[in-house]
Amino acid sequence: MSWTALFLLGFSAALILYFLLYNSFQLAFVIVAFQEVRRQLRGRVYEDLDIVYGSPFTPPLSIIVPAYNEETTIVESLSSLGRLRFPRMEIIVVNDGSTDGTLDRIIREFGFRRMEITYEERITTRPVRGFYELREGLPSGVIRWVVVDKENGGKADALNVGINASTCPMFVSMDADSLIDEKALLQAFRVMLRDEGIVVIGGQVGLVNGCEVRDGQVRKVGIPDSSLARFQVVEYVRSFSIGRTALARMNAIMIISGVFGIFRKDVVIKVGGYLTRNLTGKLAAEYAGKGRDTVCEDMEIIVRIQRYIKEKRLASRVGYTPEPLCWTEAPETFESLGKQRNRWMRGLMETLWYHRDILFNPRYGKLGWFAYPFFVLFEFVGAPLEFIGYVTVPLLYALGYLSGKFLFLFLTLSVTYGALVSVSAVVTGAWSERTGHSRERGSSLLKYRDWRHLAVLLAYALLENLGYRQVILWWRIRGIWDYYFGKKGWEKFERKGFGEAPTHPAKEAG
C-alpha cells in the first residue's frame, strides 16, 4: 500500500473517531440537559412567579435595547417591553446612529421628549448626541423610560452607553429586533433567587417564524412555513438550548445569546464593559488586548467574566435556563442565513484567539480543560474537517480505497448518530412534567400544543444531517476564511417584522 493510500486511510479513520466523539458528547449533553429540564420544570411546583414578583429580594433592573436601523421591528419590540411583568424596571433604548427612521419612529409612536438625564461615563464610548425621556403614562412596573441617541459605534458600544445611563444594579441585554416573553424576567429571577452565586443568566431563544404575534407578545407558538427556518428550530433546540444547558450545569458555559441575558452591572463594569476599540479598562486590555473589538460581543463578554470569576476565585457562576424567554426572527433565505453564520464563526474565532490562554490551563477548571478545547476542536477545527470528510470518504470509496463496511460506518456515525442526537434533543424539548398542583403543570420547553408540529420537527431532525448541516459547514468555513483575511462588520440581514403594529402600553396607560 502506497504512502498516499495510508494517509487517506488514516485520515478517514480520524474522521470516524471525530464523529464518534462529537455525537457522543452531544448525546451526553442531551442526557445532562434532560435531567436539568426535568428539575427546573418540577421546581415550578414550589416557586410560583407571584412569589418572585413580591419578593423583597427581587432587585430593580434596567432593560438595555441597542437599536441600529430597526425601523421595521422597533415598535413591536418596545411595545412588548411595556407589557413585561416585573415589579420595578427601567427601559433604556440606545439608538446607535441609525440611518433610517428608527429614532423618529420611536419618538413619534411613543411620545418621547428631549431632555437632560443623569449620565455617568463609567465605560468609555462613542459620543452621545442627546437624551429623550417618557415621563407620562408609563406602563405598570416601568419606573423610567429613556432613549439615548449616540454616534454609531456598534452593538457593544451601544450596550456600554446603556450601562452608563442605567441606575439599577442589574441589567438585561437584548436585541431591538426581538420579543421578550412577558414572564421572562420573573422566570429568570426565579433561578437567580434560588442560586445567589449567579451573576449572569441567559435563556433559550425561540424562533418567532410561524408564531402568532399580537401586541408585541407571542400568543400562539407555531412552526415556520419555510423549510430553512424549520431546520433552524431543530438546530436551536439541539445546539443552543441543550448544549448550553449542559455546559451551564458543568459551570463551563462560554456564551449567552445577545438576544437575551441578565447581568450584574458591577461585574460587567469591573471586567471593563463590552469589548470595543474605545475601552480603556485594565481588565479588558489584559484579557482581550487593547484597541480590539468583536462581531460577537455576547460570547466575548461571557468568556471574560468567566476568566474574572476563576482568577479571583469568586463563588460566582454564569447560569442558564432552557426555557424560551425571548423570541427572534430566523433568516429564511440562504443569503441571509449565510451572513449570520459567517459572522458567528468570525466572532467565535476572535474570542478563541483573544482568550487563548484558557486552553488547557488548570486555573480555569472545566472551562480550560473541557469547554474551551471543545469549541476549538468541534466548532473551529471540526468545520473544515467535517466538510472534507463528506467529500473525500465517498470519493475514496468510489476509487476503491475504502470498503463498503467503512463507508457504512462513516454514514452511521456522521448521519444516523447525528439524527439520533437531534431527535433526542427535540424529545427533551417537548418533555412535559405534570407534577403537583402548579398552574404551570404540563408545560414544556417547546410550547407546541399540536402534536403535528412536533411530528414535523422530528422529521426535520431526522433530515438535518442530509444537506442542511453540510450547507452550514460551508458557511462556517467561509467565516474562518474571512476571519483570517481580516473581514469585519455585521452584515445584518433584512427582517420581515413581527406582523401588524400593536397598540402601545404607554398610550394605553395615558
Task: Describe the predicted segments one by one.
Residues 3-10, 38, 437-452, 456-460, ...:
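Hydrophobic helical membrane-anchoring modules
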Residues 1-57, 244, 421-428, 472-488, ...:
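N-terminal membrane-anchoring/stem segments of glycan-assembly enzymes
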Residues 4-15, 364-371, 375, 404-407, ...:
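Membrane-interface helix-boundary signature
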Residues 42-65, 449-470:
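Membrane-cytosol interface motif
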Residues 12, 19, 255, 455-458, ...:
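Non-transmembrane, amphipathic alpha-helical segments
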Residues 33, 374-484:
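Membrane-embedded multi-pass helical conduit in multi-pass membrane proteins
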Residues 44-364, 377, 502-510:
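Non-transmembrane catalytic domains and loops of membrane-associated enzymes and transporters
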Residues 336, 340-353, 457-504:
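Membrane-proximal soluble regions of multi-pass membrane proteins
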